[in-house]
Amino acid sequence: YTGIGVYLEDKAVPSLAAKWKGKTSEELVHTLHFYRDIISGPFEKLIRGSKILPLAGAEYSKKVMENCVAHMKSVGTYGDAEAAAIEKFAEAFKNVNFAPGPLFLYRQSPDGILGLSFSEDVTIPEKEAAVIENKAVSAAVLETMIGEHAVSPDLKRILASRLLRIEHGIIV
């Protein structure tokens, strides 16, 4: 129901290549620590999503929040601050209804800031709809997409394959 793309700041390639150089994309796909290095890496990440079928923002955010809370509880990073940040996340999606096509974007900074944006077309909005300052919640959003219990195994495969190609100088 959702198309997802993950974009990494250009300095991600040398940062990741230092540790993962020489691995095949198949090895990377099955290496959780590779994805955890992406999630916690000292570079910006942009997650671009687009709905394929109509969906209420509240329904979408409920599932994302459930996955994030479950992950944070499993790794011991869920507390009062995270509960408050999750509520702010829910609030940002409350009045959003996704038609097929328009974008939602997550901007993740290395210092734990999660910016949320919504676009009625394919442009990136200049102003974010919400900013959540909580490193555990920010990391959990991407963790649920490419981590241990990923909602998108294809995204993991594509990410590993493209990073490997870029490392070898192949433009994708």
From Swiss-Prot:
Residues flagged as site, Important for catalytic activity: 60
Annotated protein name in UniProt: Chalcone--flavanone isomerase 1
Pathway of action: Secondary metabolite biosynthesis; flavonoid biosynthesis
Miscellaneous comment in the UniProt entry for this protein: Part of the biosynthetic pathway for all classes of flavonoids, a large class of secondary plant metabolites, many of which are brightly colored.
Function (record text): Catalyzes the intramolecular cyclization of bicyclic chalcones into tricyclic (S)-flavanones. Responsible for the isomerization of 4,2',4',6'-tetrahydroxychalcone (also termed chalcone) into naringenin.
Induction (free text): Induced during a hypersensitive response (HR) mediated by P.syringae glycinea.
Superkingdom of the organism of origin: Eukaryota
Source organism: Glycine max
Entry's Gene Ontology molecular function annotations: chalcone isomerase activity
